[in-house]
């Protein structure tokens, strides 16, 4: 089994490298692989290629790499925290909460630009903070509800209702926004990894990496929590502390990524199921790193599918993640009764 897992980890890692290079090559203008590799290695002499790669393609590919890992691990943590195979940052309304935070911040920036741009945070820390606060608020509400309602379906319904409430707040804010602000927010809400700048990456990368590192330190606690509260207590797990840590980690990762990429649906729900099916294990010592790698690989592939080489148009990335993610979840839940029963 260990040999099989090692081979799978190696194959996924190689897939990430290939998808990463292809993601840089493909676009409205196709770039030769040799020129791209030379540029990445610092040996490029092709001015146009170097400019396109370093200023547009490379930030986009890195964003896919980071966001895929972060969104997927957040989904795994949600499924473990709520012991629910359908738990996800989008289904539970956490993405909507982050969206409300960004919408409120954007509206405030429209009304009071001088106040928010004083420290130069108009498109950097302010957006991250607003998205994290929005995501954390919704997650705390869901956590409070789940402690009272032990019915999984009821918790999911509450999450969906919170998502509707968040959408209503966003609609009201959009009504009072000017045309330019409204257009900016709508484009953001479609979800995209293409608009991230190096400055934004400098903020997103360390925040998400800290969250991923924290998740890598918690597989033992996540294993205990996934087997039920009684078992977790019997092995000495501090359930309240673990839950708080999972809530904070998920909120920070989700808020930071959503702030710059917009809400990306189904990835956080589908990737953990895909990894469980592929690795045939429920051990979080395997699931956590496998989910991180698989999430990066799948979002790179989704980004590749959004763009047709030689064409100017780019599909919304949510269209691709939903097309790939929804069937995976449906097939896994329909074909694996044991997986459904494990979360009851």
Segments from the language model and where they lie:
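Alpha-helical transmembrane segments in inner-membrane proteins
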Residues: 1-344
């Amino acid at each position: 089994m260990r040999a099989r897992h090692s081979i799978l980890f190696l194959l996924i890692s190689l897939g990430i490298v290939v998808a990463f290079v292809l993601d840089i090559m493909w676009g409205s203008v196709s770039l030769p692989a040799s020129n791209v590799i030379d540029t990445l290695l610092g040996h490029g002499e092709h001015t146009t290629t170097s400019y396109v790669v370093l200023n547009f393609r490379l930030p986009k590919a890195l964003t896919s790499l980071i966001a895929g890992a972060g969104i997927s691990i957040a989904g795994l943590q949600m499924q473990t925290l709520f012991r629910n195979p359908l738990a996800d940052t989008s289904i539970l309304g956490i993405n909507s909460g982050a969206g409300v935070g960004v919408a409120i911040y954007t509206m405030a920036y429209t009304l009071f630009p001088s106040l928010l741009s004083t420290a130069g945070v108009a498109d950097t820390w302010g957006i991250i903070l607003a998205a994290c606060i929005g995501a954390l608020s919704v997650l705390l509400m869901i956590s409070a509800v789940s402690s009272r309602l032990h019915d999984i379906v009821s918790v999911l319904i509450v999450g969906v209702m919170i998502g509707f409430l968040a959408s209503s707040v966003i609609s009201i804010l959009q009504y009072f926004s000017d045309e330019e602000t409204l257009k900016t927010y709508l484009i953001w809400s479609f979800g995209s990894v293409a608009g991230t700048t190096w400055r934004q990456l400098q903020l997103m990368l360390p925040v998400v990496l800290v969250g991923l590192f924290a998740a890598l330190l918690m597989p033992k606690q996540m294993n205990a929590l996934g087997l039920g509260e009684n078992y977790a207590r019997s092995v000495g797990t501090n359930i309240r502390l673990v839950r708080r840590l999972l809530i904070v980690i998920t909120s920070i990762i989700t808020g930071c990524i959503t702030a710059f990429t917009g809400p990306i649906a189904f990835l956080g729900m589908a990737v953990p199921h895909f990894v469980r099916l592929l690795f045939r294990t429920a051990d979080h010592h395997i699931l956590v790193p496998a989910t991180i790698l698989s999430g990066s690989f799948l979002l790179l592939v989704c980004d590749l599918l959004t763009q047709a080489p030689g064409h100017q148009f780019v599909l919304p990335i949510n269209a691709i993640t939903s097309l790939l993610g929804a069937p995976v979840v449906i097939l896994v839940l329909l074909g694996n009764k044991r997986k459904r029963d494990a979360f009851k």
